Amino acid sequence: MLYQWLYSMADEFSPLNVFRYITVRTFIAFFTAFLLCWIWGPHFIKRLQLKHFGQAIRDDGPQTHKKKAGTPTMGGGLILLSTLIPCLLWVDMMNPLVWGVLIVTWGFGLIGYMDDWLKVSKKNSKGLSGKIRLAGEFLISGLVVAALVHFHGLSTAVTIPFMKSVSIDLGYFYVIFAALVVVGTANAVNLTDGLDGLAIVPVMISAATLGLFAYVTGHFSIANYLQIPHVVGAGELSIVAATIVAAGMGFLWFNAYPAQVFMGDVGSLSLGGFLGSMAVITQNELLMLVLGGVFVVEALSVITQVISFKMTGKRVFKMAPIHHHFELGGLTETKIIVRFWIISILLAVLSLATLKLR
């Protein structure tokens, strides 16, 4: 909103014309979000400590995690607040795509908050009922996607990565498909958030990549040149993505091993919802399988473990999600984390390659 006020005075003071450029506002929003998160961080963490919002640790988890008991959780609230203010200042809030992403992000964050609250208040790791959580996530994502399709003309066609001008129009079924993408991404990120800094960096990498996709899909000339779908107004989402990356960096300052704070479900679900909604709006739903490969593998490891145990009584992994399997296999926590970061970078580069390799 601030940028609109500044830009409105451009006739009297021509240098203010720079605020009409998405790139300029992206850089300003980035540093605004980082500074807010970095400055607020110590105060936010202290507040969580005073309220005794400590993390409950699973009894069946790795023994090395016992020392993490009591570490403040619900730090995802710091990320959300640090992104909201820059968005209100530097993003066009009249853009329906922006509202769609923010509603999903904050809606999923609210579900995560309720889940975290139940965990810290009851001092166990159970939290909100899985059925209630999933119902809320599908309701929010389904309504947002349906509204964007009906009122904004969001395409119901699903593009195929690495293939030029190939898409499948799902029609009315697209809303269900898109909701599955958003909910699946959110819960995959949630499962990944089990080690210090493990989830936030892949989230930042994915957000930066999707932010770039948002910029090019929102730019008619670039989208036409690359022969990718053009989504009117998607460029503004690159600013939102920049705030997520920046706030993530600010959060990592405190979340890096050994963590001073955990993001909790309020963080993992909201950030996962953000990534899923960005993938849907930029029409990169299937590409998320590549870009979010780390999240996909983590989720599949849990699904495989559950199915195997129910059908055969045996476990495929020593413990799921798979990062715990590696921990119990003797790898140190920091080595697992950094290797997952490296994999995320490689997958992001591969995803960006689809812009030309079609």
From Swiss-Prot:
A Gene Ontology cellular-component term: plasma membrane
GO molecular function: metal ion binding; phospho-N-acetylmuramoyl-pentapeptide-transferase activity; UDP-N-acetylmuramoyl-L-alanyl-D-glutamyl-meso-2,6-diaminopimelyl-D-alanyl-D-alanine:undecaprenyl-phosphate transferase activity
Membrane-spanning parts: 26-46, 71-91, 93-113, 138-158, 166-186, 197-217, 234-254, 261-281, 287-307, 335-355
Pathway(s) it belongs to: Cell wall biogenesis; peptidoglycan biosynthesis
Cofactor entry: Mg(2+)
SS bonds (residue pairs): none
PROSITE patterns xrefs: MRAY_2 (PS01348)
Entry function: Catalyzes the initial step of the lipid cycle reactions in the biosynthesis of the cell wall peptidoglycan: transfers peptidoglycan precursor phospho-MurNAc-pentapeptide from UDP-MurNAc-pentapeptide onto the lipid carrier undecaprenyl phosphate, yielding undecaprenyl-pyrophosphoryl-MurNAc-pentapeptide, known as lipid I.
HAMAP family hit by this protein: MraY (MF_00038)
Name of protein: Phospho-N-acetylmuramoyl-pentapeptide-transferase
Organism, scientific name: Bdellovibrio bacteriovorus (strain ATCC 15356 / DSM 50701 / NCIMB 9529 / HD100)
